[in-house]
Amino acid sequence: MTDSISGPATDVGQRPGKRERLVAAAAQLLHEQGIERTTLADIAAAADVPAGNVYYYFKTKDEVIAAVIEAHTHQVKTTLAAIDAHHRSPKNRLKAFVREFTAQSEIVAQHGCPLGSLCSELGKRVNRPGFAAAELMRLPIDWAEEQFRSLGRRDAHDLATDLMAAYEGSALLANTLGDPSILSGAARRLNRWIDTL
């Protein structure tokens, strides 16, 4: 699922705080470069924060990663709540969810899915905070399961997992092949599939 992490809304002309800028910069760099290639110095430079100030907010790279996971979690919950608020029927909610898949197709084709890439990388780390990443990926699956259950589907969990697998697989292919149209094609097929339920 795509998302956009930025600091909290501020008054016009007011810059987000250092911690918010660090988390937003970390999310972007982890997405673009990956965990292993991203250093605390890279994050500080991208956030326009003196490198020494990073340690005031985060003692380790793992603390930064935890903050990025928390920010992604907040963004996913916010996106799902907005879909719930704007769409009454489960089918329309699922279709809106699918539209979210293609909202940043160019970025996904260039760098992969922000959530999928992060969760995949964390799953490979020896000292991994994998549980938090798994919980992050479960958010949209659990939400989709609720929608399928509202449609009276007894196989709601399997359908929700299939939906996320279809997106993440399409995101991987779009990124590998550098072709954002893979995501829009997958979205069309998913919408037709939702109509058949």
PLM region descriptions:
Residues A67, A81-H111, A160-L163:
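Hydrophobic alpha-helical connector segments
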Residues L22-L30, H72, F101, Y167:
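Short hydrophobic clusters on alpha-helical segments that form packing/core surfaces
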Residues N92-R93, I107-R128:
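Amphipathic alpha-helical segments used for helix-helix packing
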Residues R21, A25-E63, A67:
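Helix-turn-helix
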Residues L115, V126-R138, R149-L197:
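Hydrophobic/aromatic-rich alpha-helical bundle segments in the mid-to-C-terminal region
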Residues M1-G17:
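N-terminal intrinsically disordered/low-complexity leader segments
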Residues E70-V76:
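Short, basic, alpha-helical segments at the C-terminal edge of helix-turn-helix-like DNA-binding modules
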